[in-house]
């Protein structure tokens, strides 16, 4: 199968080409077209995939609703993709919404009462549900029932509505912000981890085939190793490298073409861009390697604290360039080496010789 992209409007580049955050509607449409549809097509997340294969198979065999599923991890790792795959594997409908959209209990009630037997309800950013909406959700998850108020004032009364059995799939980048009562109602909890370069190389090769973009193994790996362990970034870089190959080359994506294209995009071999380097430079140069508080870093580089915490930091921490401590962020010796700066005596004592 191949995907024709001529029908898609030109996609403006995101603020950061290595950002794992959702981008423009046009790019999201193309991203949806590249998503795997079934578990057998899904690359990576071996532990979560094995669990889901077993639990989905059991639910399908018994013709029951799958237990409620919580997916958490950094953005861009495939939480939305997995929700679609779960519904497809179960052969049921998927209803999709997000925590901020469900402002009032009636918003959630309207969704729940329209679900058919064993359907999947996907709530992205579930940690952002309001407390009053969350209260309505509890009996729905446990007993497939909701209580709604009819009328107003003294004449108001509560009625109980029965729901069809359904599966809630909740996704969040901040599992720690979920309330304990909500977290406890998920029978299946899966943490999505960053992907290895080898896994991302398989994803890039598959996506290139769908985009009719010739690519060799070295070209795919070059894109993969700079993709920060994130499929969304890998697919975005692939599309930009494909553009470069079409204009500056013969259309084939080789290692040399990928290296030149990614250098033009200012994505270095570690997958760092200008914003990553600004953060590391701020901690190393302005704050002597730390420890430094998140708000101070945010002010010094002109970014929101939440963006730093959710989008920029996770990869730097996972790769060992930054540490979070109770006293603040600390640059590691790897960060000093990456910037070509001699570590301070304090950091040498803390981490050992460079």
Swiss-Prot record:
Organism from which the protein derives: Paracidovorax citrulli (strain AAC00-1) (Acidovorax citrulli)
Phylogenetic placement of the source organism: Bacteria, Pseudomonadati, Pseudomonadota, Betaproteobacteria, Burkholderiales
Description of its domains: Has 3 domains, the large (RuvB-L) and small ATPase (RuvB-S) domains and the C-terminal head (RuvB-H) domain. The head domain binds DNA, while the ATPase domains jointly bind ATP, ADP or are empty depending on the state of the subunit in the translocation cycle. During a single DNA translocation step the structure of each domain remains the same, but their relative positions change.
Gene: ruvB
Name of the protein described by the UniProt record: Holliday junction branch migration complex subunit RuvB
Residues binding ATP: 34-35, 76, 79-81, 142-144, 185, 195, 232
One GO MF term attached to the UniProt entry: ATP binding
Region of interest (Small ATPAse domain (RuvB-S)), ranges: 196-266
Alphabetical keyword list: ATP-binding, Cytoplasm, DNA damage, DNA recombination, DNA repair, DNA-binding, Hydrolase, Nucleotide-binding
Quaternary context: Homohexamer. Forms an RuvA(8)-RuvB(12)-Holliday junction (HJ) complex. HJ DNA is sandwiched between 2 RuvA tetramers; dsDNA enters through RuvA and exits via RuvB. An RuvB hexamer assembles on each DNA strand where it exits the tetramer. Each RuvB hexamer is contacted by two RuvA subunits (via domain III) on 2 adjacent RuvB subunits; this complex drives branch migration. In the full resolvosome a probable DNA-RuvA(4)-RuvB(12)-RuvC(2) complex forms which resolves the HJ.
């Amino acid at each position: 199968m191949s995907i024709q992209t001529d029908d898609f409007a030109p996609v403006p580049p995101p603020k950061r080409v290595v950002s794992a955050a959702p981008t423009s509607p046009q790019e999201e449409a193309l991203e949806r077209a590249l998503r795997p549809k079934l578990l057998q097509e899904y690359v990576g997340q071996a532990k979560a995939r094995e669990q889901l294969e077993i639990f989905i198979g059991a639910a399908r065999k018994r013709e029951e609703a799958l237990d409620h599923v919580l997916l958490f991890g950094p953005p861009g790792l495939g939480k939305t993709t997995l929700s679609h795959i779960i519904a497809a594997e179960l052969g049921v409908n998927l209803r999709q919404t997000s925590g901020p959209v469900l402002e009032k209990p009636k918003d959630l009630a309207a969704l729940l009462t329209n679900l058919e037997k064993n359907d999947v309800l996907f709530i992205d950013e579930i940690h952002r549900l309001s407390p009053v909406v969350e209260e309505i959700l509890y009996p729905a998850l446990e007993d497939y029932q909701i209580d709604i108020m009819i009328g107003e004032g003294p004449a108001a009364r509560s009625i109980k509505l029965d729901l069809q059995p359904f599966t809630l799939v909740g996704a969040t980048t901040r599992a720690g912000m979920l309330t304990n009562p909500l977290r406890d109602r998920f029978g299946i909890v899966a943490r999505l981890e960053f992907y290895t370069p080898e896994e991302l190389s398989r994803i890039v090769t598959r996506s290139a085939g769908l985009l009719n973009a010739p690519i060799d193994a070295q070209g795919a790996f070059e894109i993969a190793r700079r993709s920060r362990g994130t499929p969304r970034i890998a697919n975005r870089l692939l599309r930009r490298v494909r553009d470069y190959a079409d204009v500056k080359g013969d259309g084939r994506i080789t290692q040399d073409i990928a290296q030149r294209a990614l250098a033009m995009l200012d994505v270095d071999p570690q997958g760092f861009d200008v914003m990553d380097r600004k953060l590391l430079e701020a901690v190393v140069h302005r704050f002597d390697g730390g420890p430094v508080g998140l708000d101070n870093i945010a002010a010094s580089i002109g970014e929101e604290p939440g963006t730093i915490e959710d989008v920029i930091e996770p990869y730097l921490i996972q790769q060992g360039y930054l540490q979070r401590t109770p006293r603040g962020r600390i640059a590691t010796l790897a960060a000093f080496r990456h910037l070509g700066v001699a570590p301070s005596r304090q950091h040498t004592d803390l981490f050992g010789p460079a």
